Each structure stands twice: as structure tokens, then as C-alpha cells.
Amino acid sequence: MKWIPNFNSSNSLRVIFVIAVFILLFLSSIAYKHNQDLNESSKLVMHTYEINIQLERLMSAIKDAETGQRGYIITRNARFLTPYIYSRDKVNTSFIALKKLTADNKPQQENLQKLFKLITQRFVSFENCLKYSDPKTYDKRKLDNHMFGGRILMENIRFKVDEMNDIEKTYLKKRLKIYDAEISLSPLFSVSLFLVALSFILLSYRQISRDFERLKVFNKKLLISSGLISESESIGKFSTWQWDLDSDKIDFSDNQFRLLGLEPKSFAPNKATLLKYVHPDDKESVAKAIDGIVDKKDLPFVYYKIVRPDFEVRYFKTTGKLVTDQQGSKILLGINFDITDEHLLNIELQERNKELEKSNKELASFNHVASHDLQEPLRKIQTFISRVSDADKEVMSESGKNYITKIESSAKRMRVLIDDLLLFSRTNTTKKEFIKVSLSELLSNAESELAEIIEEKKAVIRVSKLPKLSVIPYQVEQLFINLIGNSLKYSQPDIEPEISISCEKVNSSDYPEILEQSIKKFHKITFTDNGMGFDPQFKETIFILFQRLHSKTDYPGTGIGLAICKKIVENHKGHIIADSTLGKGSIFTVFLPD
Amino acid sequence: MQKNALHILLADDDEDDRLFFKDAFEEIKIQTNVSFVHDGMQLMDHLMNPDNKLPDILFLDLNMPKKTGKECLIEIKKTDHLKDIIIAIYSTSSSEEDIEDTFIQGANIYIKKPSDFNTLKKIINEVVTVNWHYHTSGLNRDNFLLRLK
């Protein structure tokens, strides 16, 4: 179906979208990971920092104890011993904190264990120093030894603390380095990925807006064309309906409702409503046709009547065709025509035709009466007169013989009249069978029909070549007989008649007033004679039935011959004209279509 | 030349025409036996009666009461022992339709009733003296309607 525009971009658009979404998902997962790493590293730094602080606290507590002890030893003032007494608790607190902080680190635990041992030894050394510095138990050598030992222990503790700090620092450094490596990889990559995603989105945005523009254009066109269709439906008195065979849904056009005499969309159509307004006479046949659609997938013309809600009967013609739309669903497209006007006109025409046929029949029976019943008594009059023998006439009076002659000529004239009238009516009523024949042949037939009078008058007939035309042969032959016969009859008494017949092809446009313009070419056949001619003022009237220019005593005739000619030419959609100069001759011109 | 008298039968309802016909046969110098029937029914009865001698030539009027000439023609041509009778249609009408119909039904010649007694004699003479075997074999639509030279 061509009328649905094809938006090819929709598939590629989908792909672009999916890619862009995946890129964005990827980017956000990377960002999340970064965040996690950052969090981890800050926690790690905090951890190291805390261990460091606790170790420093431990150190300073021991140092405080050392300083307090020294002050006491020198001054023997018990106030100097206060930091020493508290330092033990401080050391323990820090120690517990450190134990917790290094719980996940085995080497540090071991270090801490060693440190604890060293610190315990240091406090033992403190006790010893206090003991040997006491004046009661004073021992200079032992005091010096313990003081010195304490100093070494102190060095060891400091060393151990530094070692632990170093381990933490190294560990921190290592971890930070790993995070750094992870993070340093990404910025360029993620920026470029982001740019790719962005450009994809921009691209699809452009495509979408372009499609949107096209859609707008098509939408406008669709609106216009649907408007035009519904307009033309109401002008043309037709309507459309669509039957989706898959979903069994039926849609009526607005005009369908109007044709049914209803407001548009006044009910939801379905298979049953298709039949609802159909005239009871036609319901069965329409239902059959509808069933036929489903089988044959096609609906030939169906003619039926419908009854509108106001009981007005309208005549409908319906046809349909099965179409498959772009989505592959099968839709039966139906068209209804309201043919009421045509139907009524048709009925009227049929009636007129019947009347015409009747009057034609009457005419034919009149012909029969004329040809048979009127001729019968006439023939008998003539035969009986012919039976009056010469011997009978001998014994008759002069006047009696005269009357017999007059009866004879009247009867003869009656016969000619009847024959001519019959001929005239037959040019109308007999079947008109057009056959392609040579006019030359018909003309020579006409000449042989007139051979007697031609010989008698010593007439000369000159004929140029005549064409082959599609004509009613016996009528054209009659036409030639009448025209030549006419020329022979009205020849000049002392001059041998000369008739020349010529033919040429002419364009109908050259004779706009007399020729049928829908036919382009005509054959113009001219009959020229040197007869007595007639007054040109009669050139129209001589073709009228029973019109005579001469008295019947001078020139016997019925006044039908030329009327027959006119009729014959008209039967051929041609034209005949006459012209003449009195005393010089006449020209009869016949136009016959090519 | 005929050895025996020709048997002629005229089927015509018109008394005057039968009279003309009879007179004409009397005046021509050919030995003939002329008999008459007045309508189509009588004609068929006559022909079907085995006591009657079959005519050599049957002159058949078309416009007859009870049974028309055309009906008789069809019936005769359908009947085995009658179909070889020479049939001359003898009618006032000269309509194309009648001529065409009777030709198709197998009549041998079509005569339009003349309006002159001498012409009638000439026609009868012509029809009676024609060699029908020869004429029938060369019969066509053009020479079916009798035209006197």
C-alpha cells in the first residue's frame, strides 16, 4: 500500500538508543566504582592515621612515665609520680585500641605483641629503678644498670613503633597506588565514551525531528486527502467501509451513515448492522453476498434496496475488494453507491422504451396493413382493368373508354404512392446493418436498375472513383437510384441528359454548420446534371415529404423520393444539400462519414 | 416438355385471385390440371389424403385463414412424402421478412401477385415451364424472388 509512508529510520534509531543507554549505564557503573574506591582509600588513610595516633599516644604515655619517674628520683617529690601512675592506664587504653585497629593484620599483631612485651619490660625496669633509687634500698650500681636497661628498652620501643608506622604507611601507599592506577585509566576513556553517547543521542534526536517533520507533512496530506475523500463521497453519493477480517472490526465512513439517513457515527457498526437497514426483500441475497466475501475474499457488484429510519427506500450498489495493509492484516474495502436517481431514471427510460417499442410495433403493423391489405384491393382493381380486353373496349363509348383509362392511371398512381410510402417508412424501421462495400458497386447496381430509362433518354453518366464505405448497402443503392432517377426525370426536353458523379474527402471542420463535428472526415459525393434545374429558393423544401415543384400531369411523382434520400443520408449520420440554377441544371451533394 | 398434364394446386382464400389464376391457366397453351383449396387446413387435409394425387407444383398464398401459408410450408417440408413438392409462394406481400422466411423454410420460388392479368399469365408460364431440377440446384436468395425479364 503506497499511501502509508515508510519510516525506515525507526529501526536504526532503536539500535542507536540501545547503544547510548548501555554506554550511559557503563559510565555510571564506572562512576560508582570510583566513588567506592575513593571511599575505601579515605577509610584506609583514616585507619593508618588512627594507628599512628594511638602509637604516638602510647609513646607519649611511656615518655610521660619516664619523665615523671626521673623527676621523682631527682626530687623525691611524690607529685612527679602522678603521670607515671596514670601512664599505665593510658598505655592499656591505647593498646586495646591498637589491638582492635590491627585485628585484620597479622604481622602488625605480632609486632604489637612484641611491643607489649617491650613495654611490660620497660615498666618492670621502671619499678626496679624506683626500688633501687629509694633511699631505703638504694643501690647505685643496680640503679645505673636498670636506668641504662630502660634506656635501651625505650630505644627498642621507639624502633618497634616506627616499624609499625612504617608498615602501615607502606601498606597505605601500596593500596593508594592501586586505586590511583584504577582511577587514572578512566577519565579520558569515560569522557570519550560520554561524547560518543552524546553524539549518538544527538544523532537520533536529529533523526527523530526529521521524521517528525516528515510525519507532519504526511499528516497534513492525509488530512487534506481524507477531507477530499469525505467531500467527494458526499458529492458523488457514495461511501466506504472497512472490515478488518482479523479483528472483525467494521468502520463506516461518515457518508455511509448519511446515505443510511443517519447522523455520522450514530452507532458502532458490526456485521449485523450491515444488514440492519437492508430492505426485507433483499436481506437474504445481501447476507449471502456478505458470506461470500469471507470465502471468496472479493465482493462482486450487489444491487439492493435499503430502508432509511424515516421509511424512505433507496437503491444501493455495493462492491468490495480484499486488501492487505502494511501490517499484513486483511481488510475488506467496501464501496456503497446510492444509485436511486439512476435507478429511477432507468425505470423511466425503460417505460419510455416500452412505449417506443409499442409505437414501433404499431408502425410496423401499419406497414403491414399498407403493404398487404391496402394493396390487395388495388391490385384487384388493376387486374380487373387489365382484363377489360381491347375487344371489350371496342364496344364501349368514347367516354367509357376514357373513364377506364383514368381509373387505370389513378390506380397506378395509388400504387406508386403506396410503394414510395412503404419505402420511406422502411428506411426508418428496417434493421440498419452497416457493411463495408464499394460505393462504385452500389452505383452500378443503381444504374442497371435504371437501365431502361437511361437508354430511352440516351443519358450519359460519368463517374469518378468512389470509395469503400461502411454503409447500409440497399439504402445507399436506393439513394443513388433516386438521385439519378430524379436527374433523368427532370432532364431538359431537347438535350441528352448528362450526369457526372464525383467524390472527394473533406474535413468536417470545413462545414461546421451542416456536418457532425465529432466525425473528422467525410466523403463529399456530388451529382451534377444538365437538367432543367429549379428555383434555388426551394433548395430546402424539395427534401420535405410530399413537396412537389411540378404538376403531376407534367411530371408524375409522389414527392417522396428526395425525402427518402434525406432519410437515408441521415441514417448514415451524413447530410444532403441541393443547389440549382433554373434552366442550367442541379447539383445534389451528399456527405457520408468516412 | 411434359408428357402428362401438370397437376397444379393453388391454396388461396381469395375468390377473385382463384378466378384470375384459373383464367390465366386456361389462356396459356400448356396442358395442366388446376385445382384449388381455400385455406391452410383444407390444403393439409388435401395433401394428407392418400386418395388425392399430389400436385407437381403448389402455389401457396401466405395470408390465409385457419392456417397460414408459412405454417403449411413448415408442415409440408417436415412431412416425408410431401417435402419434394415444388412450392411457389404466391403472395401480395413483398416484405423482406416474408421472402427471407420462406426461403429459409425451403420454398422454391417467391411470386408477388401481379396487378396485371398479362403479367400473371407470363409468370405462370415461366413457373410451369421451368426445369425445376436445374433451378433448384442453383437456387439462392437473389433468384428466389421471381422477376420477369
Model-identified regions with their sequence ranges:
Chain B
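Conserved acidic segment of CheY-like receiver
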Residues: 5-26, 58
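Acidic, metal-coordinating helix/loop segments flanking the phosphotransfer/catalytic sites
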Residues: 36-57
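Active-site residues of response regulator receiver
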Residues: 60-61, 91
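Receiver (REC) domain active-site loop signature in two-component systems and cognate sites
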Residues: 64-65
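Short, glycine/charged-rich "phosphate-handling" switch motifs in NTP-dependent
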Residues: 108
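A Lys-centered signature of the CheY-like receiver
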Residues: 113
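CheY-like receiver
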Residues: 119, 124-125, 129-149
